[in-house]
Amino acid sequence: MAVFVANESGASDVDEVRLAALARFVLDAMKVNPLAELSVMLVEPKAMTDLHVRYMGEEGPTDVLSFPQDDAFDASWSESVDDDPTTLLGDVVLCPDVARRQAEQAGHSFDRELSLLCTHGILHLLGYDHAEPDEEREMWKVQSQLLASWDGADGADGADGARGAADGAADGGEGRRGDQGRRGDQGRGGGAGEPPAAPAR
């Protein structure tokens, strides 16, 4: 499972290696097809504002946008994937400046906020949403379980624990939608400059 992290934000305090490890951890825990590829992009506020206005119709920078790439791709894990082409699951776009502000307001670390936002963005790519109360409860529950398992494993060997915690949701909980990528703080794109399709956040 390939995760590509591109830091175009100018932020020097982003632990890109840890962010990639977290993303792989979440994808593995959610039983995502190992041939899927994910792009995580970190952008400056102006770039995020442009995406936010263009794809969400809202002013100002946001914290995270998710852009699913291939709606026809089966993201679920399978034993027989040899004949499947490698396919891009989508892009998660993060804004470190906004994340840093939110971390201060929440009273936790910048790394913790980025982990939360990246996990949130990936769940949107997998069809989770929080437009309705029941969806929000399910998405927040899975998100919390994944982050707790990541914290316990420190990104090392805890994928089994996360997988167990998220099993019910990964198989289709209330928080998932048939269409991948609604609002939550995500969008869809091939890159920060030119993402294709409508985002979720």
From Swiss-Prot:
The keyword Flavoprotein does not apply. It is found in: Cytoplasm. PROSITE patterns: UPF0054. Residues 173-186 have a biased composition (Basic and acidic residues). GO terms for biological process: rRNA processing. Its cofactor is Zn(2+). GO terms for molecular function: metalloendopeptidase activity; RNA endonuclease activity; zinc ion binding. Belongs to the endoribonuclease YbeY family. Single strand-specific metallo-endoribonuclease involved in late-stage 70S ribosome quality control and in maturation of the 3' terminus of the 16S rRNA. This is Endoribonuclease YbeY. It comes from Frankia casuarinae (strain DSM 45818 / CECT 9043 / HFP020203 / CcI3). The gene is ybeY.
